[in-house]
Amino acid sequence: MMNPSHGRGLGSAGGSSSGRNQGGGGETVVEMFPSGLRVLVVDDDPTCLMILERMLRTCLYEVTKCNRAEMALSLLRKNKHGFDIVISDVHMPDMDGFKLLEHVGLEMDLPVIMMSADDSKSVVLKGVTHGAVDYLIKPVRMEALKNIWQHVVRKRRSEWSVPEHSGSIEETGERQQQQHRGGGGGAAVSGGEDAVDDNSSSVNEGNNWRSSSRKRKDEEGEEQGDDKDEDASNLKKPRVVWSVELHQQFVAAVNQLGVEKAVPKKILELMNVPGLTRENVASHLQKYRIYLRRLGGVSQHQGNLNNSFMTGQDASFGPLSTLNGFDLQALAVTGQLPAQSLAQLQAAGLGRPAMVSKSGLPVSSIVDERSIFSFDNTKTRFGEGLGHHGQQPQQQPQMNLLHGVPTGLQQQLPMGNRMSIQQQIAAVRAGNSVQNNGMLMPLAGQQSLPRGPPPMLTSSQSSIRQPMLSNRISERSGFSGRNNIPESSRVLPTSYTNLTTQHSSSSMPYNNFQPELPVNSFPLASAPGISVPVRKATSYQEEVNSSEAGFTTPSYDMFTTRQNDWDLRNIGIAFDSHQDSESAAFSASEAYSSSSMSRHNTTVAATEHGRNHQQPPSGMVQHHQVYADGNGGSVRVKSERVATDTATMAFHEQYSNQEDLMSALLKQEGIAPVDGEFDFDAYSIDNIPV
C-alpha cells in the first residue's frame, strides 16, 4: 500500500538539481522542481484511488495511497515530515474528510486538497473555511493535478517570509539532529542532496515549533485575560440604585441648598448615606438639572417677556416657578404636582399686559370691579412691595399658584388696615350681644355731638379708599376710580367722622376715618338706606324696620326688590353742617337705587317701629359705610348685611359652583344702570377692566 520510493520525493529531485548546479553550474532547479513531489492520497473508492495514482505518477510525483482516513492520520503522525501535500475525499465511512482536514491542519500544518463528486456550493464553502487549499470535482482532470505543486510553494514561501525565532541552544541542536535523520531514507546521497533534505525538513520542523509556541502563547494570553477580567471586576465600584427614598433625600438636599448653588460635595454631606460617592451624586445631579430644564422650558423665556409678574412694581415675585416660596418644579419632581399641571400653570402666567395707572400703581393692585371675590391671594396679586397706601400687612405668604385659579372664596380687601370676617364677628360678640358692627352708627336719639365750629380733616388725613364704588359715584363723591384718593382739597366736618359706639367702643377703631375703611364682607347683600334732609346744628334719628318678622337668607340679586327681613336697629346720625339747605341722602333700595325721602329745612324724626320685632339672628352682622361728597353737599350711608357662619353656609350652598357665581356676577354687570339722584347702580359694561 505504501509507495517505497516516497523517501526521495521533492528533496531528492531538488537535491540532485542543486548538486548539479553547484558542480557544473549551467542548469537550474526550476526545470526539475515538480518531479518527486510527495503526495498522500486518501479515498475509500479503490477505483478512484488507482486512477489518481496513475495520473500523479505521470506527473512524476511520488504517491502514497490510503483507503481509510484513520490509517492516513496514523501514518502522518508517525512521519510528520514525510509528505508535502495531502489529497483527501470528502465523504468517507470511517471519518469525514473535513475532520481529517482539521487534524492535519492542526498537527502537521500541511496543505490539504479536498475532492468529491458533490459540487454544491455549501460543501465547497465548508471545505475552504476549514482550511482546504483547493477543492477538486470528480472526475479529476490531469490539468488540475499538474498544478497542485503551486500550493506547496505558496505554503513554504509564506513560512520563509516569516523570520524564524530561534529558541534555546538545545532546541536548535535537536532540530538539526532531526533534520539529519529525516533527510536520508537509507540510501547514500551526496552532500548537496543532504543539504536540500535538511533544508526541507528544517522548514517543516520550524513551522511545527512555531505553531506549538503560538498555541502556548495563546493559552497563556487566555489565562492572563481571565485574570485581568477578574481584577477589573473587583476594581469596579458597586452600582448605586436610586430608590424613591434615596431620591427624596437628594431632592430635599437640593432644595435646601438651592438648585443653582447645590454642589455634589454639599449634597453628599446633607444626605449622609453610607456607600454613596461624590461621583454618584454628581451624575444624579446632572440628570436632575436636565430634567428640571426640560420641565421649565416655558419659564426659561419668562425673563424676556414684559408681563405683570416681572414689572418693576412686581419685582419681588421672582421667577414664576417659585411663587410664594413654593418650588413648583420640586413639587413636580416629588410627585405632588403633575408635570402637565406645571406646564399649564407656567403657560397660564405668560402674556398678561403690564398696565399702570396715572398714579404709578399697577392696575392689578386696584381691586377688580368685575367680581367681589378674589380667586387669588391678595398678597400674590398685589405684591408686598407696594407701600403707597397705609402700612404693609404683615401676613404669612399663602400658597397661590396663578391668577384665575380658585383657592377659596376670599374677599378682596384693601391693602391698609384690614379686618377679616372672623375679627368682625369677634368684635360683635364682645359687645354684649350688640347686633351692630364697628361700622354701624349707634343710637343717638338722646345725644348730639358738641356744636360749634368743628375741626376739619385735611385731604391727607381723610384719604378714604373705597374700591367697591362705581365710577359715577366715585366721580360725584370726589374719589378717583384708580387710586381712590380724594381729588378735591375740600375738608370734611369732624361730625361726619366722629361715630362712636355706645356699647362696645373698644371694638370700633374707625373714629376719625382710618386711612382705609374695610370693605364689608359681602357687598352684594341688601343695602337699605334712608334719605334725610340736613340742617345745621340739628340732631337726627332715623330708624327703619322691616314689615316682615321672619328671617330668610339674604338675596344676592341686585335687581330684585325685596323688603328687609329684619330691623335696622338704632340707626342715628348727629352732625353739624357748615352750610344751610343742604341734604344728606341715604339710599333705601336693595338694588342701590335711589328712594329718597327728603324734606328741606325741616326737622325730621322717623319714629321707631317694631321694637319688639324679631332681632336679627346672631349669624348676621350689619355694616354701614359713610361717604362724604367732595362738594360738601351730601352724606351717604350704605347699610349692608353680613352673613357669618350660618349665612355663609347658605351662601356656599347657593353658589357652590364657580361657574354659577361668575355667570351671576356677569349678568349683574350687563344690566343698564338705574337713573337716580345718587347713583348706586350696578357696574356698567364699560367699567369692566380687561
Swiss-Prot record:
Keywords: Activator, Cytokinin signaling pathway, DNA-binding, Nucleus, Phosphoprotein, Transcription, Transcription regulation, Two-component regulatory system. Residues 220-232 have a biased composition (Acidic residues). Disulfide bonds: none annotated. One of its GO terms (cellular component) is cytosol. It comes from the Eukaryota. Detected in the whole plant. Expressed at the root transition zone. InterPro entries: ARR-like, CheY-like_superfamily, Homeodomain-like_sf, Myb_dom, Myb_dom_plants, Response_reg_B-typ_pln, SANT/Myb, Sig_transdc_resp-reg_receiver. SMART domains: REC (SM00448). Residues 198-211 have a biased composition (Polar residues). Transcriptional activator that binds specifically to the DNA sequence 5'-[AG]GATT-3'. Functions as a response regulator involved in His-to-Asp phosphorelay signal transduction system. Phosphorylation of the Asp residue in the receiver domain activates the ability of the protein to promote the transcription of target genes. Could directly activate some type-A response regulators in response to cytokinins. Regulates SHY2 by binding to its promoter. Involved in the root-meristem size determination through the regulation of cell differentiation. Belongs to the ARR family. Type-B subfamily. This is Two-component response regulator ARR1. The gene is ARR1.
